[in-house]
């Protein structure tokens, strides 16, 4: 009987390992540089110094609940969780505005005395952790990635400003870990969906979210999870940079034909963010060539070419060219930290258009030019 039980457990163990490797593939990436970095004090993600872009931030403390509900379609408007995700960037900007202007010091006090308790309460009440999908509707997991991206930056800000009170950080990490787990398509909370059901824009958003969450908490498991997602898309980039997934690719027209280039822009932007986090801990992808001869910077170079070509722009919404309208351009701040040449026409365009609001309208990394005024 004991021998039989041993054999049975061995089979189960092998099966689990096989399934894990089938799902992820055998992870042959060398994470030694990440392990070393996580054993020491990691650098801050951004500068977090008050500047002219730190204006207009508001302490949004809207009460929500644990339900993360979908809309009927991808074009039905923003989810409540999206508005919640915006609150982190607003709060950081408000604090830094108070730091930048001595006559607005009350903004810092309100941040500490009002917003932080609100956020801790949100963590205790597990905001947006119970997923409610609508058939054919927008992805609720995607909104959890958005929360994790902005929450990660917020936590990095708090860490580097030494603003935590006893027990606050632990409560928020516990909540964030639930968001992380339930954002996986194959989690039981997501109605039988599978990881391979994700579109490239979803994979790239997960890559940025998981790598950031792993970075700020020095959690190697979660960082690896995100890095595998980054690799999934990074490996697709050819030597000429023509990523072509949502634009002229297999996912073209899945939502609206006119959104193809806009979605390609958001997808590649999230890959830039993920690549940046990797670069901070020695995992190179921004300029490093993959087996096809492609890299992140090559994909962005090509994106810049087509985004400034009138023939390629025909029939496209062009919202990714308009900082005041789009929700996916704040990654330009991160890009300029990695490449300061300004040779890319799309990057150069956003350097000019962001002078007014500093990406205050973006869904992720909103107020990015406030949290890191990347130009020296």
Question: What is each model feature region?
Answer:
Residues 13-14, 208:
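Short intrinsically disordered, low-complexity coil segments enriched in acidic
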Residues 4-13:
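Sec-dependent N-terminal signal peptides
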Residues 16-20:
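Sec/Tat signal peptide C-region and signal peptidase I cleavage site
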Residues 21-40, 44, 273, 277, ...:
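Terminal, non-catalytic domain-edge segments
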Residues 76-283, 293:
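Aromatic-lined, polymer-binding surfaces characteristic
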Residues 21-78:
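Low-complexity, Ser/Thr/Pro/Gly-enriched N-terminal "stalk/linker" regions
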């Amino acid at each position: 009987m004991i021998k039989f039980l041993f054999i049975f457990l061995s089979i189960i163990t092998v099966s689990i390992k096989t399934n894990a490797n089938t799902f992820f593939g055998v992870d042959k990436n060398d994470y030694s540089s990440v392990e070393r970095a996580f054993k020491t004090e990691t650098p801050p993600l951004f500068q977090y110094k008050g500047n002219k872009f730190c204006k207009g931030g508001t302490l949004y403390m809207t009460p929500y609940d644990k339900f993360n509900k979908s809309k009927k379609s991808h074009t039905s408007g923003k989810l409540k969780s999206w508005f919640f995700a915006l609150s982190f960037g607003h709060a950081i900007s408000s604090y830094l505005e108070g730091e930048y202007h001595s006559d607005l010091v009350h903004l810092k006090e309100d941040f500490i005395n009002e917003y932080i308790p609100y956020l801790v309460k949100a963590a205790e009440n597990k905001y947006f952790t119970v997923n409610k999908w609508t058939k054919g509707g927008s992805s609720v997991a995607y909104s959890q990635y958005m929360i994790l991206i902005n929450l990660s930056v917020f936590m990095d800000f708090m860490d580097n400003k030494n603003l935590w009170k006893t027990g606050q950080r632990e409560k928020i990490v516990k909540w964030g870990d639930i968001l992380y787990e339930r954002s996986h398509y194959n989690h039981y909370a997501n109605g039988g969906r599978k990881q391979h059901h994700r579109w490239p824009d979803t994979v790239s958003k997960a890559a940025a979210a998981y790598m950031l969450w792993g970075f700020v908490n020095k959690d190697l498991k979660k960082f690896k999870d995100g890095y595998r997602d980054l690799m999934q898309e990074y490996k697709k980039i050819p030597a000429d940079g023509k990523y072509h997934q949502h634009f002229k690719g297999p996912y073209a027209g899945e939502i609206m034909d006119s959104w193809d280039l806009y979605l390609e822009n958001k997808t590649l932007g999230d890959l830039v963010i993920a690549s940046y986090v990797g670069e901070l801990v020695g995992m190179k992808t921004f300029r490093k060539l993959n087996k096809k001869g492609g890299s992140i910077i090559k994909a962005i170079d090509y994106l810049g070419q087509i985004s400034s070509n009138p023939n390629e722009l025909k029939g496209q919404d062009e919202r990714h060219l308009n900082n005041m309208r789009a929700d996916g351009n704040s990654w330009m701040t991160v890009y300029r930290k990695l490449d300061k040449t300004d040779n890319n026409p799309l990057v150069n365009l956003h350097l000019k258009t962001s002078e007014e609001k500093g990406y205050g309208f973006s869904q992720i990394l909103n107020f990015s030019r406030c949290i890191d005024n990347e130009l020296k």
